[in-house]
C-alpha cells in the first residue's frame, strides 16, 4: 500500500490540472474521479468520454489503475488523456493510495 500524503503531492503536481476528486466536484478536461473505485471505464455521469474509454469495459481498482497509470495510451488506445504516465511503481502506489481515500470522502 502506498503513502497517502506522497500520493496527494503527486496528484496535485500531475493530475489536478485536469481532474477533481471531491464529491460533486466539477469535470475539467478530465472527469471528476469521486467514486472511481468499482466504477467501469467511461462511466462518470455528465462527462463526454471517447468510445475507447466507454468500450474498454474494465472496472477501476488498484490493479487496473496500477497498469493504466503506467502508460494510459497503451492501456486504452484512443483515450483523450494526454498524460504520459508514471513509470515508478512506488509513485503509482502512492497515487492510488491517495485516490482510494480522496475519491470516497
UniProtKB/Swiss-Prot annotation:
GO terms for cellular component: cytosol; mitochondrial intermembrane space. Its main location: mitochondrion. Binds 1 heme c group covalently per subunit. Phosphorylation at Tyr-49 and Tyr-98 both reduce by half the turnover in the reaction with cytochrome c oxidase, down-regulating mitochondrial respiration. SUPFAM superfamilies: Cytochrome c. It comes from the Eukaryota. GO terms for molecular function: electron transfer activity; heme binding; metal ion binding. The modification N-acetylglycine is found at residue 2. It is found in: Mitochondrion intermembrane space. Disulfide bonds: none annotated. Gene3D superfamilies: Cytochrome c-like domain. It holds the Pfam family Cytochrom_C. The modification N6-acetyllysine is found at residues 73, 100. The modification Phosphotyrosine is found at residues 49, 98. The modification N6-succinyllysine is found at residues 56, 73. Keywords: Acetylation, Apoptosis, Electron transport, Heme, Iron, Metal-binding, Mitochondrion, Phosphoprotein, Respiratory chain, Transport. Heme c binds at residues 15, 18-19, 81. One of its GO terms (biological process) is apoptotic process. Electron carrier protein. The oxidized form of the cytochrome c heme group can accept an electron from the heme group of the cytochrome c1 subunit of cytochrome reductase. Cytochrome c then transfers this electron to the cytochrome oxidase complex, the final protein carrier in the mitochondrial electron-transport chain. Plays a role in apoptosis. Suppression of the anti-apoptotic members or activation of the pro-apoptotic members of the Bcl-2 family leads to altered mitochondrial membrane permeability resulting in release of cytochrome c into the cytosol. Binding of cytochrome c to Apaf-1 triggers the activation of caspase-9, which then accelerates apoptosis by activating other caspases. Belongs to the cytochrome c family. This is Cytochrome c. The lineage of its organism: Eukaryota, Metazoa, Chordata, Craniata, Vertebrata.
